[in-house]
A protein has these predicted regions:
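Active-site hotspot residues in diverse enzymes, especially metal/ion-binding acidic/histidine motifs
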Residues: 1-243
Length: 243
């Protein structure tokens, strides 16, 4: 992953090619495995309470370790998938960029790049074109439910990708979003309650291994770093009963 992020040749490629390269490198066969594959690649994924205004963020540490931090507010599995792909885009495209130093226009530009990367990454063009050909009424949000289950991506994201590929007319696109708004699908889509939200497991498993095998007693860690249990739980997004 580090090599992908620091490969200067990537700057000469378009986002779709970079997304295809990343998907192949991570061996993503289905988006249902996205979180697992990201953790397997070396990315540390954590959950934290970041309030309602922040969905997720990502960073490279000074030791060149990639982290993705997800908000733990109630959110659908498909929206979490998009957050993960969006943050992967930042890790690969915007390596070590100081976000605080960017102008408003610069920040808007890199956010669009991360959004576009996520769409290309989650919905590979060739396969998506084949699957979309079965859609009969493209302006009807309910027509996208089978694709939502297959790709684990929101109805809105599916239609947007299709529209950008020229598969819907302007009028069809406008009618689609009018229907989406009228039915309240901007906030809650069909199937959102049926698709289980997968939580990060890598860091939890490492900590569980450390404590169960007494590699480092919990008290020793707390005393060494002068922290209390609640801080450690908050830092790694753990439940009260985990430690």
């Amino acid at each position: 992953l580090y090599n992908l992020a620091t490969d200067n040749n990537n700057k000469l490629l378009n986002l779709e090619i970079i997304a295809e390269k990343a998907r192949k490198t991570l061996d993503i066969q289905t988006n249902a495995d996205l979180l697992y594959k990201l953790e397997l690649s070396g990315i540390y994924v954590l959950e934290k309470n970041m309030g309602a205004s922040i969905d997720a963020y990502s960073t490279w540490t000074n030791q060149e370790k990639p982290f993705i931090i997800l908000g733990n507010k109630k959110k659908s599995a498909v929206r979490r998938n998009f957050d993960l792909a969006h943050e992967l885009g930042h890790l690969l495209l915007h390596y070590k960029i100081d976000m605080d130093s960017l102008t408003k226009d610069e920040h808007k530009k890199i956010e669009k790049e991360a959004n576009d990367f996520a769409a290309f990454f989650l919905l590979p063009k060739e396969q998506f074109l084949k699957d979309f050909s079965i859609i009969k009424k493209k302006s009807n949000p309910e027509s996208y439910l089978d694709l939502k289950m297959k790709y684990m991506v929101s109805i809105g994201s599916l239609e947007y990708r299709a529209y950008k590929l020229g598969l819907l007319t302007f009028e069809e696109n406008r009618y689609f979003y009018a229907t989406l708004n009228r039915k309240g699908y901007r906030k809650n889509e069909p199937l959102d309650e049926d698709i289980a939200i997968i939580r990060p497991g890598k860091v939890r498993s490492l900590l569980d291994l450390i404590f169960k095998n007494h590699v480092f007693p919990l008290k020793e860690i707390l005393d060494h770093y002068y922290i209390d249990r609640s801080f450690l739980e908050s830092l790694f997004g753990l439940e009260d009963k985990f430690l």
